[in-house]
Amino acid sequence: MQAPPSFYEGDTLEVAKKLLGQKLVHIVNGIKRSGIIVEVEAYKGPDDKAAHSYGGRRTDRTEVMFGAPGHAYVYLIYGMYHCFNVITAPVGTPQGVLIRALEPVDGIEEIKLARYNKTDITKAQYKNLTNGPGKLCRALGITLEERGVSLQSDTLHIELVREEEHISSQYKITAGPRINIDYAEEAIHYPWRFYYEGHPFVSKK
């Protein structure tokens, strides 16, 4: 079942934790690619100095952050790596959750091809398929074309995992500082990164 619009409403930190264990789905050329979310980071503009929307900055890139929750915010870093975020909080409150890592589930062959241009890969390469925000976007075929897309769409959405299949019983959720935000002054220390401790696809222990 797709996560309903109400899933994305409310406190961004709580939404971030709720996203863990759910499945991010992208349909590419009719083929489902997906992964279980195992690591996220929350960004709470306009007060969070790590957020693109800090200080209420509105640009063509960040405009989607000010819109309705439950939409995709995709941007480029270093001019080449895409990052996928879920917009949260009410309209006008620019907050979101970065999906940092997935455990691949559906479309594994397509994911391998997207990452390595081959399907015969090593165990080490398999562990690197989706253990980072840029890697997972490449694996699932998420690009700037998906910026602003509603997560109620048929082709891009969060699929709720049934309780009996949810991996939360196997892993403890750990909170810690976010990664690669050296510019963010005191916000460097906010414990707004949430991940499944010990999961092999987490990007950084």
Swiss-Prot record:
Record bears the keyword DNA repair: yes
InterPro entries reported in the protein's UniProt record: Formyl_transferase-like_C_sf, MPG, MPG_sf
Pfam families recorded: Pur_DNA_glyco
EC number(s) reported in the record: 3.2.2.-
Keywords associated with the record: DNA damage, DNA repair, Hydrolase
Domain of life assignment: Bacteria
An example Gene Ontology molecular-function term: DNA binding
GO biological process: base-excision repair
Transmembrane segments: none
CDD domains: AAG (cd00540)
Major enzyme class: hydrolase
Keyword Amino-acid biosynthesis: no
Gene3D superfamilies, sorted: Methylpurine-DNA glycosylase (MPG) (3.10.300.10)
Similarity field: Belongs to the DNA glycosylase MPG family.
Full protein name: Putative 3-methyladenine DNA glycosylase
Species in which this protein is naturally found: Bacillus cereus (strain AH187)
